[in-house]
């Protein structure tokens, strides 16, 4: 999920190979200086949906930048029969379901998604990777994921209001940890950022290359080579990434499956020589924020705070923290 302008919530449907734009009608600006805390959100959601905590899966969270309400994508049940639900939580802790019955919406189809029967070498469905992340950047929706093209790793730049999605751009990167060029690994998380006053995508991949890609090159049918500006360590999956400014300097904050939460300087990202040889760690330096543990989801809350979903011994907690 990702928010666009005026309370529009973009939701990806990999199985259906579509992206929905939902008008949440949630445009009232929140007062500045607020925070958010909701402990045991998995238990509260399970009670709301009439099931047990082990029968729900929180897929994503997104903060409405206007109202500061938190939108939560949930699967009720496990496996192929799981039912998707979108919930909305406010600062008082109240959770309600976002009714989709009469909601104003538009959709765009992704024409060259992986076949529903396609599997990777581990036997996992490639169709479920049709959409791996979304970001609204410079008036366009950027959709990361896989396609059925030769360069399966795909980024689509889709104008909003929606026009046709097109086939997207095939992405090639050099993966330093693997020592080779790759075209089949999908972007796991991305964020928009201006480099030399030009809109770029910062994209992170499994095991953990960090790559810059100019948005202007994301034309349907094109093949684009990203610049790998950092290798942040293998055996890791990046989960979420935000950009923020603190004390006049820009930073990237990245949550990871097994390497904690990383803080990286965003200044002069174009000054790092692209990685083109096998390496373990190289490029943009980072520090690990030792106090942030068990982070599963991350989004920007406001200019001073981030929202995190953390696992505290089985209890999933939603809360804001001061940006480090």
Task: Label the predicted regions.
Residues 2-324:
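Sequence/structural signature of beta-propeller domains
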């Amino acid at each position: 999920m990702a928010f666009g302008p005026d309370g529009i919530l973009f939701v990806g449907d990999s199985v259906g190979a579509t992206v929905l734009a939902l008008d949440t009608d949630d445009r009232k600006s929140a007062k500045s200086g607020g925070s958010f805390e909701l402990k045991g959100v998995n238990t509260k959601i399970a009670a709301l949906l009439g099931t047990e905590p082990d029968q729900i899966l929180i897929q994503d969270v997104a903060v409405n930048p206007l109202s500061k309400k938190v939108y939560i994508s949930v699967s009720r049940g496990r496996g192929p029969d799981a039912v998707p639900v979108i919930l909305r939580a406010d600062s008082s802790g109240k959770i309600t379901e976002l009714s989709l019955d009469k909601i104003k919406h538009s959709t765009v189809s992704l024409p060259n998604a992986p076949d529903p029967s396609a599997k990777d070498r581990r036997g996992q469905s490639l169709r479920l990777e049709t959409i791996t992340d979304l970001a609204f950047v410079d008036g366009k929706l950027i959709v990361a994921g896989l396609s059925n093209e030769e360069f399966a790793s795909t980024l689509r730049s889709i104008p909003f209001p929606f026009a046709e999605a097109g086939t997207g751009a095939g992405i090639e990167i050099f993966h330093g940890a693997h020592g080779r060029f790759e075209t089949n690994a999908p972007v796991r998380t991305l964020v928009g950022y201006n480099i030399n006053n030009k809109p770029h995508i910062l994209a992170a991949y499994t095991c953990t290359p960090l790559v810059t890609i100019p948005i202007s090159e994301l034309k349907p049918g094109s093949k684009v080579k990203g610049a790998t500006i950092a290798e942040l360590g293998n055996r890791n999956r990046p989960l979420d990434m935000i950009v923020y400014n603190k004390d006049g300097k820009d930073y990237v904050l990245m949550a990871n499956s097994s390497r904690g939460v990383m803080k990286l300087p965003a200044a002069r990202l174009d000054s790092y020589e692209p990685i083109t040889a096998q390496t373990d760690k190289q490029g943009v330096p980072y520090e690990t924020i030792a106090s942030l543990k068990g982070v599963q989801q991350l989004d920007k809350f406001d200019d001073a705070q981030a929202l995190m979903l953390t696992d505290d011994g089985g209890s999933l907690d939603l809360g804001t923290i001061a940006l480090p």
